[in-house]
């Protein structure tokens, strides 16, 4: 029995990591599809430099609601993301950084390495224990949308 407990703990940890990764990937797919659709409809405000401005309150609510519905995640899950600057490497409206927390664990996706690159590689980060999202860093660019933009108790036309 003493040999079995450590191996079961490792198995459980791997299962938890896979569950968080599946939730985060579901969120990423839903968020990217929602942003692509909004961009195609001309609903995303673009500034004079060709970058995206944060959406107004009503648009942010609508986008966040659609992402929550498409991802089928619990509304208690927290997420936030930024969009990449459009250039030859990335098409317009590509998610650059996505942070996700399900209330117990946290994971980050980066389209390119962050700073320092060794601690913030491109792709999915390791799953970490956390009860909430960290404060958005200005080094990660302009925060475009977050789960708290969805406010079901507030009227949105």
Identify what each model region corresponds to.
Residues 1-26:
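Amphipathic alpha-helical segments typified by the pilin-like N-terminal helix
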Residues 27, 31, 81, 95-98:
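Hydrophobic beta-strand residues in large extracellular and virion-surface proteins
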Residues 43, 53-64, 115-118, 126:
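Short, flexible N-terminal segments of the mature chain
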Residues 77-79, 83-84:
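Long, low-complexity intrinsically disordered regulatory regions
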Residues 48-76:
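Acidic, glycine-rich loop-and-strand cores that form catalytic or ligand-binding grooves
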Residues 85-157:
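Short, surface-exposed interaction loops/tails
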Residues 13, 32, 39, 121-125:
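A generic structural signal for secondary-structure junctions
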Residues 29-51:
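Alpha-helix exit/C-cap motif
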């Amino acid at each position: 029995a003493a040999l079995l407990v450590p191996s079961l703990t490792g198995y459980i940890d791997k299962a938890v990591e896979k569950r968080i990764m599946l939730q985060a990937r579901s969120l990423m797919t839903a968020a990217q599809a929602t942003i692509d659709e909004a961009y195609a409809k001309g609903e995303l405000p673009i500034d004079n430099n060709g970058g995206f401005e944060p959406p107004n309150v009503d648009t942010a609510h609508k986008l966040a609601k659609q992402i929550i519905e498409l991802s089928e995640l619990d509304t208690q899950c927290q997420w936030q993301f930024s969009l990449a600057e459009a250039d030859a490497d990335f098409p317009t409206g590509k998610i650059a950084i996505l942070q996700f927390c399900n209330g117990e664990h946290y994971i980050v996706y980066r389209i390119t390495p962050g700073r320092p690159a060794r601690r913030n590689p491109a792709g999915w980060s390791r799953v970490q224990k956390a009860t909430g999202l960290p404060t958005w860093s200005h080094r990660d660019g302009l925060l475009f949308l977050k789960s708290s933009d969805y406010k079901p108790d507030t009227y949105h036309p």
